[in-house]
Regions:
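Flavin (FAD/FMN)-binding glycine-rich loop and adjacent Rossmann-like elements that form
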Residues: 1-178
Length: 178
């Protein structure tokens, strides 16, 4: 069996100046159920409303530094400064979050290969903050994975139906890639 440590180790063990005084083994980076999506102009790919959409639509993370509002928003807390930061995504212009972890830029392929760019969604808005997968009972881990998937589907649904962008429109053209 391989020995391992999770979370934040105490300063007395590591000598790191920013380490906490006491060990915090449950203090782990959130996990994310990523998904791929593309944008096909003129088509409507709106998914069915996820079961937990109402919860995730209203969810405000209880973290320090504080998150600036709802998780499903184009605003997030910068991880370094903690200051509210605006995010944008414009699949037509290929800017902002749309290019972050983009899988395929249709401009780099023979015309017609892809109807639109394909982007992998691993954004601050779908980081699951309500529990860990490590060192928890299997049933608890499965519940966290289910809820993380609900969060990711809720983010997609929010973008398709409620999210406003600079040009004041939602994007039902965003398609979930199976």
């Amino acid at each position: 069996k391989t020995e391992y440590v999770t979370g934040a180790e105490p300063q007395k063990d590591t000598g790191e100046p920013h380490a906490p005084a006491e060990a915090a083994p449950r203090n782990m980076q959130s996990f994310t159920c990523c998904f791929a999506m593309d944008y096909v102009r003129g088509e409507d790919h709106t998914i069915e409303k996820p079961r937990e959409y109402a919860f995730w639509r209203e969810f405000v993370p209880a973290i320090k530094p504080p998150w600036p509002g709802r998780l499903l928003s184009w605003e997030y807390g910068d991880p370094i400064s903690g200051k509210p930061t605006k995010l944008e995504t414009d699949p037509e212009k290929g800017t902002g979050l749309w290019t972050y972890r983009r899988i395929a830029d249709k401009a780099l392929f023979v015309e017609g290969t892809y109807p639109g760019d394909i982007s992998l969604v691993n954004w601050p808005q779908n980081d699951y903050l309500l529990g860990n997968l490590c060192d928890v009972p299997e049933k608890e881990a499965a519940q966290h994975i289910f809820r993380a998937k609900q969060l990711s589907l809720s983010l997609l649904y929010w973008m398709q139906t409620e999210a406003r962008r600079k040009f004041n429109a939602t994007v039902p053209q965003i398609a979930f890639e199976n």
